């Protein structure tokens, strides 16, 4: 189904954003595109957009039930979401509960090491630069966020982790790490934006001890493990089984 929408405002690797009749809201279309390594690796995966849209809707509503503000308004169709219009902050927040990925490549920390408290990393959102890791001094030099806003961003990200980590554990999933995009709405409120899905979270099946079989996230695509849509579908099934039906704005 193609919804009635306004002009295309932005197209990213996984979503298209369109104007809507309400100037404080936009329509987000989740695409079937799969990308990795800053879009150097690409593929089309049927049903990926639908699965990520439905998972994100459930998780945004979960966060809101715990008092965490998000840009989410509701779903308009299987692959379409209505969200508040926000100014996305060009800093990506990554929360790491378990050491893996780039952390293990860049440090001597062993794969699978539990991180308590969770490690919070900040990255500058710029594909051309490879989304570099930021230091305190570089954040101050760039001047993209004030010290006060940065503190709010970090506090909000840790609140998200405090909700998602036990939620996924109850579903038999380990929330290894995840990335967040945050934005400011027209009232200046800081909101969780973008999406929360296996594209943005590393999720391991707690019932599996096999290092590859347990992966239920985008690493299946990155590492050519196959079964990407089956893994996303399993996450969607578990999440939807634990959440009410998402709000419908269609």
Curated annotation (Swiss-Prot):
User: Which Pfam families does this chain map to?
Assistant: SAICAR_synt
Enzyme Commission number(s): 6.3.2.6
Which InterPro entries does the entry link to?
Answer: SAICAR_synt/ADE2_N, SAICAR_synt_PurC, SAICAR_synth, SAICAR_synthetase, SAICAR_synthetase_CS
GO BP, sorted A to Z: 'de novo' IMP biosynthetic process; cobalamin biosynthetic process
Q: What class of enzyme is it?
A: ligase
UniProt family annotation: Belongs to the SAICAR synthetase family.
Q: What is this protein called?
A: Phosphoribosylaminoimidazole-succinocarboxamide synthase
Which Gene Ontology terms cover its molecular function?
A: ATP binding; phosphoribosylaminoimidazolesuccinocarboxamide synthase activity
Its lineage opens with: Bacteria, Bacillati, Cyanobacteriota, Cyanophyceae, Synechococcales
* Involved pathway(s): Purine metabolism; IMP biosynthesis via de novo pathway; 5-amino-1-(5-phospho-D-ribosyl)imidazole-4-carboxamide from 5-amino-1-(5-phospho-D-ribosyl)imidazole-4-carboxylate: step 1/2
SUPFAM superfamilies membership = SAICAR synthase-like
What's the catalysed reaction?
A: 5-amino-1-(5-phospho-D-ribosyl)imidazole-4-carboxylate + L-aspartate + ATP = (2S)-2-[5-amino-1-(5-phospho-beta-D-ribosyl)imidazole-4-carboxamido]succinate + ADP + phosphate + 2 H(+)
Keywords, alphabetical: ATP-binding, Ligase, Nucleotide-binding, Purine biosynthesis
**The organism's place on the tree of life at top rank:** Bacteria
Which residue pairs form cystines in this protein?
none
